Amino acid sequence: MTHYEGDLRPTTARFVIIASRWNARITDALVTGARQSLAGNGIGEDAIDVVRVPGAWEIPMAANRVAQGGQHAAIIALGCVIRGDTRHYEHVADLCAEGLMSVQLQTGVPVLNGVLAVERVEDAEARAGGSHGNKGEECALAALELVNLMELLP
C-alpha cells in the first residue's frame, strides 16, 4: 500500500489570493493572514499574487480565469457574506462555493474556499484573526499542502 500526503515544505509554485472588497475590514484581515502564512512557510512575496473583486459573487469567475491561465498552482478564495434580512445571502454563499468547486474540478487547480458565510459580523471577526483563528491563514496552509500533494499523486 502506498500512502500519499502533502506537507508544508516550500515550493517554487505561484499562488494567487482572490479576495472580495465587500466587507473589506474582514477580507483585508483574511488576505493578510494568507500572505503571512505563505511567507512563514517559505513562499516569497514574488510568488504570491492578489486579485481583488467587488464581492463574493465575482470570485468564481476570477478563479476560473486564473486557473485557465496555468500560472498558479493553487487559488485561495477569500470573502465574507453576512446574513441580512433577505435570502440573497444564501444564494451568494451557496453559488460561490459551488462555483469554486466547479473551477477546481474542471481545471485540476486546487481552489481553497475561505469565503466566510456567517450570521453576524462578530462571527466574521472571530474567523478573521479573532477567537476562531484566521481562515485566510488556514486556507493558505491547505493550499501549500495540496500543491505538494498534487506533485506526489500519480
Swiss-Prot record:
Ligand binding ((2S)-2-hydroxy-3-oxobutyl phosphate): 85-86, 127
Chain residues that bind 5-amino-6-(D-ribitylamino)uracil: 22, 56-58, 80-82, 113
General function of this protein: Catalyzes the formation of 6,7-dimethyl-8-ribityllumazine by condensation of 5-amino-6-(D-ribitylamino)uracil with 3,4-dihydroxy-2-butanone 4-phosphate. This is the penultimate step in the biosynthesis of riboflavin.
EC number, as in UniProt: 2.5.1.78
Subunit relationships: Forms an icosahedral capsid composed of 60 subunits, arranged as a dodecamer of pentamers.
Family under the similarity heading: Belongs to the DMRL synthase family.
Keywords per UniProt: Riboflavin biosynthesis, Transferase
Active site, per annotation: 88 (proton donor)
Catalytic reaction list: (2S)-2-hydroxy-3-oxobutyl phosphate + 5-amino-6-(D-ribitylamino)uracil = 6,7-dimethyl-8-(1-D-ribityl)lumazine + phosphate + 2 H2O + H(+)
Cellular component aspect of the GO annotation: cytoplasm; cytosol; riboflavin synthase complex
Xref: Gene3D superfamilies: Lumazine/riboflavin synthase
CDD domains named in the record: Lumazine_synthase-I
Species this protein is from: Xanthomonas campestris pv. campestris (strain ATCC 33913 / DSM 3586 / NCPPB 528 / LMG 568 / P 25)
GO molecular function: 6,7-dimethyl-8-ribityllumazine synthase activity
Pathway(s) served: Cofactor biosynthesis; riboflavin biosynthesis; riboflavin from 2-hydroxy-3-oxobutyl phosphate and 5-amino-6-(D-ribitylamino)uracil: step 1/2
Lineage: Bacteria, Pseudomonadati, Pseudomonadota, Gammaproteobacteria, Lysobacterales
Enzyme class: transferase
Protein name as catalogued: 6,7-dimethyl-8-ribityllumazine synthase
Domain of life per record: Bacteria
HAMAP family registered for this protein in UniProt: Lumazine_synth
